Amino acid sequence: MMQIERMRPEDFDAVFRLLSQSFPAGERRDAAGQRALLSDSAYRIDILRAPSGGVQALMASWDFDDFVFFEHFAVDPACRSGGIGGQMLDALLACIPKPACLEAELPETEMAARRIGFYERHGFTVNADYPYFQPALVPGGSPLPMHLLTTGGARTAAELRAIETLLHTRVYDKTPAAMI
């Protein structure tokens, strides 16, 4: 049985190292920004601990009233393609009593297309007709075109606009109009 647990303060360095290995600087916060999020009651990081005690995988998420937003999902490069990412995602989805949402890069590269396929195999739907941009996470950065993926099927434009507004104001601390 997979043991997923909430990140402890002493796990921060290993978690941030995995985030840094898995996401370019423009798609994640710096260490101080990441650490500051840990005091937000809606934010959490769940980890899959290796038998050795290290961090094999992580999921950073935001628990909102109507959905859970999976902000960052990363698997240690040495553990990829072994099925633990899918198992962890399925286990987390089974524990939440509401829909989940995440952002994914447009399928413009083979890796981005494979990533979207992974999420589709685990119950997510790509809302491809909705134009969405992830605000810049670093000063001077550019917004990134992304797809919003949701569980429970495709969402209406009004539902996606509400999700976008909440993500931009709560997760990214920006207004949707300000990020364009």
Predicted segments, located by residue:
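Conserved beta-strand in the GNAT
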Residues: 47, 54-63, 67-74
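C-terminal "cap" of GNAT-fold acetyltransferases
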Residues: 110-113, 132-180
